[in-house]
Amino acid sequence: MTDDPGTQMAVLEEGPEIEPGQVLLQAEHLRKYFPIKHGVLIQREVARVHAVDDVSFELRAGETLGLVGESGCGKSTLARCISRIYDLSGGTLTFEGRDISRSSRRQLRPVRRDLQMVFQDPYASLNPRKRVGAIIADPLRIHHAGNREQIRTRVIELLEVVGLSAEHVNRYPHEFSGGQRQRIGVARALALRPKLVIADEPVSALDVSIRAQVINLLDDLQDDLGLTYIFIAHDLGVVRHVSDRIAVMYLGKIVEISPAEELYERPVHPYTEALLSAVPVPDPDLSAQRQQIVLEGDVPSPISPPSGCRFHPRCRYATDICKVEEPQLTLRGSAGHLAACHHPLSVGTAPPESAAAVVTGQ
């Protein structure tokens, strides 16, 4: 690379041109297992945590893919696999046409400019010993993106983009509110002009009163900068607002993926149905009329997941085939709506004696 800082900045802004609608990221059979070892002097693997198990999807430039599911279903682990914070246990990950599945840290360096993360906790993700200007400037310095003056100009520009001002550059994280800290995290993620931003539950640690501000900021930035998002959350109301498509995860697997509105209007997988039944409805009359599906029991252990369909111990539609044969993601309904279920809701299968109770929402 040239030693001229101005040239370095120009090189940073260039990269493979992916037109809106073209595939930016493709995941095929991704797996991430965490070994459980036992022993003192000689440790041996006695079990594995199946955190992400055979996950496949593609993401097109300019779209937002929402990723939802209960706590512990593997959403955040999948995000860290995509960003290559974690090494993969198996599968193939392609970004901008390049296979990055087994790339070394050095080989990943140019990829990280185009793939950034916004983390869940704005309190823990910012170094309390650094001033805000230095935090946002870190990616620029690491990637040699200009001289000192160019970096300072870029930092001030980023602060203004996320709704802060130049006067905040010398303050420390503890001097900001939770919403402002998350804006700083967004500014840091945007520093290198990425193509893909993975937002890992970016509003779950914030007060309800300021969640909408951060969501609207991310929405506006996508329109202005042409960003592509993977938006992770457990709040399906939030995901519906920001997503073009939504993938539902359960115990390390994607069980349904669909255009956002169709998922909410016509869910196919029983787990999705249960999640949607728990979403609050602002109209008290409608809320009183609809049914809430209460899943009994806890999520099974990812160390020893159930055979067949992983959801069958809690599913009110489960039959014998669900216990022995694992369902595959299959096209259901319109193009792009896939679900992994032996008894999809569209078939209208009457539920047998169930592992769940159905109660009228109060």
Locate each region found by the language model.
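Conserved ABC ATPase signature
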Residues: 172-176, 180
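The feature captures the beta-strand-to-loop junction immediately N-terminal to the Walker
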Residues: 68-69
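Helix-to-loop junction immediately C-terminal to a conserved catalytic motif
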Residues: 83
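Short catalytic/signature loops enriched in Gly
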Residues: 4, 8-23, 36-43, 48, ...
